[in-house]
């Protein structure tokens, strides 16, 4: 903890002083790219992905050998306002399903040869109902961010961030509204299927929560504390830890992007090592990516969460790295280069 004794101060200092890009590694990748047996630029965005990998790993021949999907699960007190068709008990049930190998993310990880870790964040203790009180106190929020930083402890060279939590699209919408303004209608979507009266209650909850906590919402970490969830705080911590350890990150959908948005609002450079795996069908996600100036890799109409979009995108990143490292140069292959 910092000398001031305030739990967030260490994170504020960290966010202000993050390691920057390795421009030498990026330059080396771009120089090799033009020597490979293909027309310059013909692999399109794959070439930019390799440059991004080099920039944030510091490796001149970037590889992806230990990709990991980290899924963070949390529960939310605001679900007591009857804003979602599923009860909060589903969060714990889905965590058990992940452990048993029965969820969509398990199958995608098998298909793409990705590691998977699931983090259960005190599911029996939901965060505070944000329409009545702060989601967390500062100490709890900071401790949860620190817990999220441990996601990389086992070693990985590409971190995919995902989540599970009934009610957390409401939380993500409230965070987006607090950070970027607009109206609740700009950010609130159906989530797991909220329509009709459920949708109206969801909209009302977001409006009420942002109005209630307005005096605290000038500081992005206070936005996280007042309106966030444990899984969102943990994802923010994981993103920061990855930056410190030169690990590129693929962010999944709307909720995971809300965690990244908190860091972006504190320092726009804090998520430069992040790629956004997909734009989800949740309507606020496309707007949120636009606010951060981010272009997603995939647009498949998905809105499941669980890290599924990030995991699918990881295979594209793996392929990009292999194309760069494995392709022969014109000289090696005896192929004539362009004039």
Swiss-Prot record:
Matching Pfam families: DBI_PRT
Gene Ontology terms for molecular function: nicotinate-nucleotide-dimethylbenzimidazole phosphoribosyltransferase activity
Keywords assigned by UniProt, alphabetized: Cobalamin biosynthesis, Glycosyltransferase, Transferase
Pathway membership: Nucleoside biosynthesis; alpha-ribazole biosynthesis; alpha-ribazole from 5,6-dimethylbenzimidazole: step 1/2
GO biological process terms held by the UniProt record: cobalamin biosynthetic process
Similarity section: Belongs to the CobT family.
Role of this protein: Catalyzes the synthesis of alpha-ribazole-5'-phosphate from nicotinate mononucleotide (NAMN) and 5,6-dimethylbenzimidazole (DMB).
PANTHER family: NICOTINATE-NUCLEOTIDE--DIMETHYLBENZIMIDAZOLE PHOSPHORIBOSYLTRANSFERASE
HAMAP family on file: CobT
Record-given protein name: Nicotinate-nucleotide--dimethylbenzimidazole phosphoribosyltransferase
Species of the source: Brucella melitensis biotype 1 (strain ATCC 23456 / CCUG 17765 / NCTC 10094 / 16M)
